[in-house]
């Protein structure tokens, strides 16, 4: 009359929100780097190439930092080269602090406010 006990350890991923918040935090702190060359010492060939901060006053990135080589294109203006259409002429929400808000969407150029009355038919019964 023996018994068998099975123990199972489960590893769970964090919630999508937790992962998103973590990545957003890293993205906001990302730094531009250049591909550095330490020299041609054969003994240190493994460390021959490394990432250096573009600005020498900044500290080198750690293995968990997000880095980038090229600046993002200016999405505020039209560019046939990068395929960005710009934001001029788009509708925005003047009271929203989100992505559809005028402050962000208009890229600091200012905006014109327009009042519009919309009449729609509804099948309302009273």
UniProtKB/Swiss-Prot annotation:
A lipid is attached at residue 1 (O-palmitoleoyl serine). InterPro entries: Wnt, Wnt1, Wnt_C. Transmembrane segments: none annotated. The keyword Lipoprotein applies. One of its GO terms (biological process) is canonical Wnt signaling pathway. Keywords: Developmental protein, Disulfide bond, Extracellular matrix, Glycoprotein, Lipoprotein, Secreted, Wnt signaling pathway. Ligand for members of the frizzled family of seven transmembrane receptors. Acts in the canonical Wnt signaling pathway by promoting beta-catenin-dependent transcriptional activation. Plays an essential role in the development of the embryonic brain and central nervous system (CNS). Has a role in osteoblast function, bone development and bone homeostasis. This is Protein Wnt-1.
């Amino acid at each position: 009359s023996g018994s068998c006990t099975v123990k199972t350890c489960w590893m769970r991923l964090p919630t999508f929100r937790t992962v998103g918040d973590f990545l957003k935090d890293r993205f906001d702190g990302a730094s531009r780097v250049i591909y550095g060359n330490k020299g041609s010492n054969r003994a240190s060939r493994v460390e021959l190439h490394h990432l250096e901060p573009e600005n020498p006053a900044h500290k080198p990135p750690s293995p968990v930092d997000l880095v980038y080589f090229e600046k993002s294109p200016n999405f505020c203006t039209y560019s046939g080269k990068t395929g960005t259409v710009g934001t001029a002429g788009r509708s925005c929400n003047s009271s929203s602090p989100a992505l559809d808000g005028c402050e962000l969407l208009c890229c600091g150029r200012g905006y014109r406010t327009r009042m519009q009355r919309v009449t729609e038919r509804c099948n309302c019964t009273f």
